[in-house]
């Protein structure tokens, strides 16, 4: 693929839906919020390359360490490897697809998903609160890639810390983006400096993120866009190589 003529999109889930950093041929990057992943795709050309920080391709059974991609990339990240969490089985992801109206219902659904996850994993493993929090977004992309196989050649899973590592000559970031749930300014500055070395203007990165997205969501989407460019140019690498496939034929790999 040739990135010179491709629209490149980097996406990450956020409170308002999805944050996307995009760049067309010869244009500066822009940032926008979309309420759904379908809306994001509808706003991009059919030949755009999209890299997204979200698991794609679900296992029927989960082994120790999660899917193959997670097990492969963790050792590269050193102290940052905790940012890569294991994905449970497809059955656990779809154990409860309700729209939760109370916190009690949310926790009850988490318990149900954990029960299914333990029954479909070896050793038995429940679902972390962090993983459960993005289940609905994983299902969004999963449903689209099942219904539209054409998307499988232009929507790619990536991971911010793996992407930063690849851009940093395969050296993991030294500082965390967050400490105890709060943004770590030093870690953010480290990543902004790396993004600037790869073509971003600091004024773009220093702007407040759109309403409904956090500052770290913005940087994650920004590095995803660079990964989309690497995929388009053929310089990105999938983990594993070649990618696996899930029960629906959806490719399973983290690209960076």
Where are these regions (language model features)?
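RNase H-like (RuvC/DEDD) metal-dependent nuclease/polynucleotide-processing core
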Residues: 2-8, 13-256
């Amino acid at each position: 693929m040739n990135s010179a003529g491709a629209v490149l999109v980097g996406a990450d889930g956020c409170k308002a839906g999805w944050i996307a950093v995009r760049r067309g041929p010869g244009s500066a990057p822009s940032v926008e919020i979309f309420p759904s992943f379908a809306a994001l795709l509808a706003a991009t050309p059919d030949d755009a390359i999209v890299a997204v920080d979200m698991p794609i391709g679900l296992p029927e059974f989960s082994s120790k360490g999660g899917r193959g991609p997670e097990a492969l990339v963790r050792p590269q990240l050193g102290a940052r490897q905790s940012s890569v969490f294991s994905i449970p089985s497809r059955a656990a992801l779809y154990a409860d697809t309700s729209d939760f109206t109370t916190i009690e219902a949310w926790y009850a659904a988490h318990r149900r998903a954990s029960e299914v996850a333990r029954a479909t994993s070896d050793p038995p493993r429940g679902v972390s609160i962090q993983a459960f929090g993005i289940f609905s977004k994983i299902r969004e992309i999963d449903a689209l890639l099942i219904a539209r196989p054409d998307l499988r050649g232009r929507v790619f899973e990536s991971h911010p810390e793996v992407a930063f590592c690849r851009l940093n000559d395969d050296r993991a970031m030294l500082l965390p983006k967050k400490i105890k749930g709060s943004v770590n300014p030093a870690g953010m500055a480290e990543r902004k400096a790396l993004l600037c070395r790869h073509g971003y203007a600091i004024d773009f990165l220093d702007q407040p993120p759109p309403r409904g997205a956090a500052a770290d969501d913005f940087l994650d989407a920004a590095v995803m866009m660079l990964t989309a460019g690497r995929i388009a140019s053929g310089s990105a690498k999938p983990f594993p190589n070649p990618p696996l496939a899930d029960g629906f034929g959806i490719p399973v790999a983290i690209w960076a």
